Design a protein with these regions (language model features):
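Positively charged n-region of N-terminal signal peptides that target proteins for export
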Residues: 1-7
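Preference for extracellular/luminal or secreted protein segments
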Residues: 2, 20-89, 325-430
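Second-shell loop/turn segments in exported
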Residues: 39-43, 72-77, 94-103, 151-164, ...
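Second-shell residues forming the walls of enzyme active-site clefts
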Residues: 61, 103-123, 127, 209-374
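Hydrophobic faces of well-ordered beta-strands that scaffold small-molecule active sites
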Residues: 67-74, 92-97, 127-133, 181-185, ...
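Glycine-rich, aromatic-flanked loop segments that form ligand/cofactor-binding clefts
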Residues: 116-146, 166-188, 210-234
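Active-site-proximal loop/short-helix segments
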Residues: 141-146, 180-200, 231-247, 279-282
């Protein structure tokens, strides 16, 4: 087993070394590329997953496509009828679950199962069932699950094999609960102790440490079929402002961005990444509009897609945060601006009225031409491909008794004991 992890770590180190040279950050919008000429033989050579994704896309209504652009949360006392409305009317891409939504493993399992069953009756694509499970400060697993410490402690231990095992173990327990997407890890580089939001949640203060441990955690998660969504692109570390309450403005130039903030994201993309969370942070030296990255075509398209070569899904940080909604006069303006800039999915974790506004804005934008059909299909196709690639279904991976044996299992505790012996880092099971 240790030999396997040694091989994994060698591969990760090589990937990170290669990724430390980040392509030049774009100076601005690049001219459009002329459309490729059609090739009748290309259809025969098309990848089967791509062909299936395009077939599913062709059969979807505009309402179904708009719904795929939303991941939503809901209050703990939400009735089944309201959950059904998310699925039947809004046709959402997925849900984000918080501790308010369940009291223990049994209720979490039952909720995930119910959402999947409802969705399977009416929608063409399975749900993302998501959570924030970083370990430590940000941990949503119910009592009885295996809890790892904050990323800062894991990074200080200096054992990427430990980090891989942490990601893998978390993924096993998430999968047992019916969760298939995790908004983790944090890839922000934090050396400023005044950054109270992220100082414990970051693996360290250098691109090398954050890259090594971030890619290790991602590989561990994805080895068990859970989609990792690292955050907060393009980097929330160099500030003491919190985007929950304001729009952080970071005075970073091109050279610093290229040699520092972007390095962990480039390493993760090169190692294999299907989704990334985009933060509500502004970099006026790089994008003079002053818009947050989650609304900036410079970051969403020029840097993320063209410079870093990312082909997966871009998901916003929660758009109910002040760092986002304060950037335009209305929610509708924010949404249209973000989507046309290149964002794929809007995360809206709390308020039904805002979720309805976002869905209506997207639908109206598609119908009145502010959002082109080509742009809509581009994002929805990415989402379909990610769901197909990761084998998402609306059935639970395990029956309840088997799932309960996995969650907080003796095997996982034994892994923690092994890690404690190897590193001297105390990992707790709660």
């Amino acid at each position: 087993m240790k030999r396997l992890f040694s091989i994994v770590i060698v591969v990760l180190i090589l990937l990170i070394a290669a990724s430390c040279t980040v392509p030049d950050v774009s100076e601005g919008n690049t001219p459009p590329v002329p459309p490729a000429q059609s090739d009748p033989e290309a259809e025969d050579r098309k990848d089967p997953l791509e062909a299936k994704a395009e077939s599913l896309l062709a059969g979807m209504t505009i309402e179904e496509k708009a719904g795929q652009l939303l991941i939503v949360g809901f209050p703990g006392d939400t009735k089944k009828e309201a959950l059904q409305d998310y699925i039947d009317r809004l046709k959402v891409s997925g849900f984000i679950l918080f501790s308010r939504n369940y009291t223990d493993f049994d209720s979490l399992y039952a909720l995930a199962r119910s959402l999947k069953e409802m969705n399977s009756l009416n929608n063409p694509l399975p749900l993302f069932i998501s959570i924030d499970e970083e370990g430590g400060t940000v941990s949503r697993l119910p009592k009885g699950g295996t809890r790892f410490p904050d990323a800062r402690k894991v990074g200080k231990a200096g054992e990427p094999g430990l980090t891989y095992k942490a990601g893998q173990t978390i993924a096993k327990e998430l999968k047992a609960a019916g969760i298939n997407l995790n908004f983790a890890p944090v890839l922000d580089i934090v050396e400023n102790g005044e950054n109270k939001l992220l100082i414990k949640r970051s693996y360290g203060s250098t691109p090398e440490v954050v890259s090594l441990h971030g890619t290790s955690f991602i590989s561990g998660l994805q080895s068990e079929g859970v989609t990792a969504v690292p955050k907060h692109f393009p980097g929330h570390g160099n500030t003491n402002q919190d985007s929950h309450s304001t729009l952080p403005v970071i005075d970073t130039d091109k050279a610093a961005m290229q040699s520092r903030e972007l390095v962990p994201f480039k390493a993760a993309i090169d190692a294999g990444l299907d989704a990334v969370m985009v933060g509500h942070i502004a970099f006026p030296k790089l994008d003079p509009t002053g818009l947050p990255a989650s609304m900036s075509s410079y970051f969403l398209t020029d840097v993320l897609r063209k410079d870093l070569g990312f082909g997966g899904i871009s998901i916003s940080d929660d758009i109910e945060m002040q760092g986002y909604i304060s950037s335009k006069d209305t929610v509708e303006e924010c949404v249209i601006s973000s989507f046309n800039a290149g964002l794929d999915i809007f995360l809206i974790g709390h308020t039904k009225a805002i979720q309805d506004q976002v869905y209506k804005a997207l639908l109206d934008g598609c119908r009145d031409g502010r959002i082109s059909e080509e742009r809509l299909n581009e994002s929805v196709l990415r989402i379909i491909k990610a769901k197909l690639k990761n084998g998402l279904t609306d059935t639970m991976e395990y029956e309840i008794e088997e799932a309960k044996r996995i969650f907080g299992s003796d095997e996982h505790k034994a892994i923690l004991e092994e890690l404690n012996g190897d590193t001297g880092t105390f990992l707790l099971s709660r």
